[in-house]
A protein has these predicted regions:
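N-terminal leader/targeting and assembly helices and adjacent pre-domain segments
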Residues: 1-155, 246-275
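Acidic, glycine-rich two-metal-ion catalytic cores of nucleic acid-processing enzymes
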Residues: 154-258
């Protein structure tokens, strides 16, 4: 697979997942001293409400979004050196973190901080279910407590990985889109990670031209259960990403274009009429 400047570095996702996992597993130390499993849920909720925990969640979110923003700017600079929209791109980059780009930047930080802050509450719900199951099975309170503490690292790791994988991609798509549309570029090429793990409903989207304002429902296009309409990278567990169309000469026509609810093969002239 050839290098693509718009593809997010996997290290950002890994670092984010590890940081979230470390933060959540740090709460486990407070749980080890509890004698009763019935105190675990209330303790987790109490710890999650502490200002220190909330500040740490905000710091992790800001670190991830800032790293993505920095990498995204580098990608746009590379695009400016090559594409026909170079002057417009440079002009936009000179504005820095202002306008709608700043709004999106702050929204992404707030959203991610909220996801991390709510993670202990999700774990608390899981703990409640484990306690109820243990009680129904007639297990001793001490055994239920030990079982919960044994599973806690696995739960926190799984949740951390899901948040990191989903939210880093969503943030990348949001940052790419807001910059593209500030320049006046509404079209992009849907790119997949081009490996065996690409879901079937996304593999047929590879290379298709999409308008950011009119995203497809990839599942509906192949008669599968729909998760709604969304852009590349903008749904759970998705590793796809948008490659902004900065130069129409980069596209070999006829080309696949998503338009009017379907994927169509279009000539250059046909595409120019809807562009």
């Amino acid at each position: 697979m050839k290098y693509n400047k718009w593809k997010m570095k996997r290290t950002i996702e890994k670092a984010y997942a590890n940081a979230i996992k470390k933060l959540i597993q740090g709460l486990q130390d407070e749980l080890k001293n509890l004698d009763s499993p019935f105190l675990i849920t209330s303790t987790i909720k109490s710890l999650a409400r502490q200002p220190t925990f909330i500040k740490k969640a905000e710091a992790l979110a800001k670190g991830m979004v800032t790293q993505l923003f920095s990498d995204n700017v580098k990608s746009w600079r590379q695009a400016a050196n090559k594409g026909s929209q170079g002057k417009m791109i440079y002009k936009e980059l000179q504005k820095g973190l202002t306008g709608q780009i700043r709004v999106t930047f702050n929204e992404l930080i707030n959203q991610n901080a909220n996801y991390i802050s709510s993670l202990p509450l999700d774990i608390a719900k899981y703990v409640d279910r484990r306690i109820a199951k243990g009680v129904l099975e007639g297990k001793r309170a001490a055994d239920i407590r030990d079982e919960i503490l044994r599973y806690y690292p696995h739960i926190s790791e799984t949740r951390a990985q899901l948040i990191a994988r989903t939210e880093t991609r969503k943030a990348q798509t949001a940052l790419t889109r807001v910059r593209a549309q500030a320049i006046g570029l509404n079209w992009y090429v849907w790119r997949t990670s081009e490996d065996s793990r690409v879901r079937k409903s996304h593999s047929h989207m590879e290379g298709v031209l999409i308008n950011f304002n009119y995203p497809p429902s990839p599942e509906r296009l192949i008669n599968k259960k729909s998760y709604g309409n969304y852009n590349a990278g903008d749904i759970f567990n998705c590793r796809c990403y948008p490659e902004p169309l900065t130069d129409i000469n980069d596209i070999k026509f006829p080309h696949k274009v998503y338009y009017g609810g379907a994927i169509r093969n279009m000539t250059k002239n046909q595409f120019l009429k809807i562009m």
